[in-house]
């Protein structure tokens, strides 16, 4: 099982480093050349592609991902993720790392199929309504969730006993913040080494569960009255 590196602790596991080798980016299945790590950009195609070709390209990728379930260990999607494509990605049973920048995928139930997954960034998930599929990814080491506007209870994440890095973010591009009912679930996640909590609001206004994260090496919080009151105790964390 993966363990976070010092670099991942300092910057975050999904931080973009210009000096690191980037994944090959492709549009069509025909560009694939036996790589097990790939960036697929098969949506939001420009006017160089006809409507017919756009539909074909998406369908070809969905079929390929389902029909070749042992192909990839890492996938990145920086263009719009659609539900059909999301479901197809979840057929990749060897996948260890998945990055989804944004999209519309209200049903994430098939994520549960990815039992080898260790690193997951799932962004702009405003239509997602349940955390249960994520809570069943027992091998997750690092998780970044962005803009899950329909969810305020993050207690299911306490089931992730190997999780070392957790980032809960709202929407940086708009005034919408993420509302979290309580941080009480953190009391059951003392293995965390990295915790980032930005553009959010804690409904019960209690940030004290963070003080029980004795293995924490990186902490990022939005400044607010409740955080400022805990500052003398927060700076004593490892």
Give the positions of each predicted feature.
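Concave beta-strand-loop units of leucine-rich repeat
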Residues: 3-108, 116-238
């Amino acid at each position: 099982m993966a363990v976070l590196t010092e670099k991942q602790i300092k910057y975050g596991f999904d931080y973009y480093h210009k000096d690191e080798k980037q994944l090959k980016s492709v549009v069509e299945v025909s560009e694939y050349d036996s790589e097990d790590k790939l960036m697929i950009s098969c949506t939001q195609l420009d006017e160089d592609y006809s409507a017919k070709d756009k539909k074909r390209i998406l369908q070809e990728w969905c079929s390929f991902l389902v029909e070749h379930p042992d192909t990839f260990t890492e996938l990145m999607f920086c263009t719009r993720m659609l539900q059909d494509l999301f479901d197809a990605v979840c057929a990749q049973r060897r996948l260890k790392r998945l990055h989804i920048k944004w999209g519309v995928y209200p049903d994430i139930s098939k994520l549960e199929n990815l039992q080898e997954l260790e690193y997951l960034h799932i962004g702009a998930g405003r239509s997602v309504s349940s955390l249960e599929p994520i809570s069943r990814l027992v091998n997750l080491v690092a998780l970044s969730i962005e803009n899950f506007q329909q969810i305020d209870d993050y207690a299911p994440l306490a089931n992730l006993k190997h999780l070392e890095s957790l980032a809960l973010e709202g929407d940086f591009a708009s005034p919408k913040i993420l509302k979290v009912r309580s941080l009480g679930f953190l009391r059951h996640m003392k293995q965390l080494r990295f915790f980032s909590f930005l553009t959010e609001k804690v409904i019960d206004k209690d940030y004290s569960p963070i003080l029980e994260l004795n293995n924490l090496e990186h902490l990022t919080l939005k400044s607010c009255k409740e955080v400022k009151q805990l500052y003398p105790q927060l700076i004593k964390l490892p």
